[in-house]
Every structure is written in C-alpha cells, then in structure tokens.
C-alpha cells in the first residue's frame, strides 16, 4: 500500500494505492497519517480509493478509526472512487450507513461546503 497526500483548499486528499491489509503494514498506517493531519488542524479528509485493489478487516478498522478520530474533533472524513468489490465489503460491514461515499472527486469536494 502506498499513500500520497495532496491538498485542495483546506481539504486533505489521501490517494491510496494497492491493498490495505495487515501484512502490508509499513512504518505508518492510514490512521496515523489521518491523525497527523488532524493534529495540524485539518478537519476535512477525503480518502481516494481509485487505485485500491483489496481491503481486509485490518483496513476496514483503519478507515473506521480514522473516521472516529476525525468525527470526535468535529471534522469530516469522506471516501471517493470505491470499486464495486470494495463497496460490497463496506455494505456487509455496515460502513455505508456511517461513511459518506462518492463516485466523483469533484462531488466529494463540494460536499464539504
């Protein structure tokens, strides 16, 4: 898994690539990267899943932990470009009832305002 951060106005966009699974853990997890942005004062986080091929229960936990951390500070965390396969996983885990998920980045960005 590789994660690159970019900014658009006051929104932090994390472009995630590869597989989000426990066996691919690097030194820094997605949740840690989100927490770093929150600690620096950012409150609008967008996770771009366009290049994500697979997610396991660890990855689902990372997303949920990121959502909770953001929500607890009054921020918003949203997801964009989820594949049908990943969307099914989010449906089964009931995350579609908690998370805002968008098909297009521009729509997701506008939803923050």
Spell out what each predicted region is.
Residues 2-4, 109-113:
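Short hydrophobic/aromatic patches at helix-to-coil boundaries
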Residues 1-15:
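Short beta-strand/loop segment at the start of cytosolic alpha/beta domains
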Residues 84, 106-107:
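Acidic phosphotransfer microenvironment of two-component signaling modules
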Residues 100-104:
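Short acidic-hydrophobic, aromatic-tinged amphipathic segments that line or gate anion-handling sites
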Residues 20-98:
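Amphipathic alpha-helical interaction surfaces in cytosolic regulatory modules
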Residues 12, 107-110:
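A short acidic, often aromatic-flanked loop/helix-cap motif at beta-alpha or helix-coil junctions
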